[in-house]
Amino acid sequence: MRIVGSSQTNVVMDAELKRVAQRAIGVRTPNPRKEGLGQIIVPFDRDLAWAAVTYMRTPTRVLWDVARTTAERLEPLYDDLLRDLLEDKRTLWRDGDGISVEARHVENFPAGERQIVGTVKNAIIDAARRRGATLHLDPDRPTLRWIARQDDRGEMVLSIDLGGGSLSQRGWRREAGEAPLREHLAAVLLMLARFDPRKDTLVDPMCGAGTIPIEALHAGRGVPRTPSSPQARAALKALGLNGPKSGPPEPLFADSQPLVIGCDVDLGVLGAARDNAYEAGVDKEVVWQRADARSLSPALVTDIAREKGREVRSGLILSNPPYGERLDDEDLYGLYRGLAEACRRFRGQPWRAGFIVGTPLFEEAFFDVLGRPRIKKPLANANLRAYFYLYELQ
């Protein structure tokens, strides 16, 4: 089983897989084999595959590698895949299923992408027919998505996309905002910042579309993805990956009730974030506060907590501030400097502050106020090179 995420997230995905496997199905996973900077590979197990697709939040895809070949021409590619699929006696499809096939990273194969897709499609459909099942091509609404790609060694690997598409799409986003943070990357930030929903109050001072607050609540509770993903349901059902228990999957940490606060200076942005939270089922659980990020203070957080009958024990400031697309360098530096000053007000308390930013101006502004970060990690955000910074404020 191949778990795929953004670059530089191998360690995070491994940690999440171990936690999910232990909580959801009561097993310890072996140490994975890492491939590149954004993929981990573990032996395929049906219950583990179900748990990964249902509960993991940091990957973009979960794949089941079912065949591979060193073929360098279309004819042997067809022959090798057909042979592997005929010899594999596991459930790989259901009679009558629609499939789609896509080719990725096949630039070094001596044939065009469409030729590769057609060859792979023929091998799958022919193998299914010889095993007693009839499949048909349905690129728009497939039950199973098949992916053929060349790995780092030049081998062609054929996989089934167990999630039925991108796992980053949770199904709740109605308003994206001007510079949305992808959902899986928000989950990565929460892991890197060591968010503990049992005791941490989370504050996003520039919440935008609300991705971080929404993801904090879902990740904190271990909310299953499946109810909002018909593609994942169809794929899991077709492969007989139904999990160890009957009935719909339950949250892994149902009693988790973290205090989560989303702030923004723009009322329209806050309204859009609230709409997204409504679609995600957490609109009544996120506290939305109109506030300039530079005015954030412990007193504001304490007042909000008191209104909710909560106590602030420790906290995490986590945000995806602007990178400068609509601000000149002077204004951007001033914004970052004001944000750093706001974080400094939490000094002496058990708080941390984490940010994903794509400009060196951020580190310069924060260094003048808070010094060096405890963690500086490269990450990619929407194909932009960025860094995650974590500051210890206590």
What are these regions (language model features)?
Residues M1-P142:
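Non-catalytic nucleic-acid substrate-recognition regions in nucleic-acid-modifying enzymes
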Residues M1-Q8, V12-E16, V20, C263-A272, ...:
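Conserved Class I SAM-dependent methyltransferase catalytic core
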Residues V106-F109, S166, P322-R326:
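A short, flexible beta-alpha/helix-coil linker loop
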Residues W146-G163:
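C-terminal edge-of-domain segments
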Residues L158-R194:
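SAM-dependent Rossmann-like transferase core, predominantly class I methyltransferases
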Residues L181-P298:
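Conserved S-adenosyl-L-methionine
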Residues V223, P227-G247, R306-I317, P322-P360:
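SAM-dependent methyltransferase catalytic-core segment centered on the flexible catalytic loop
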Residues S295-E311:
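Short conserved loop adjoining the S-adenosyl-L-methionine
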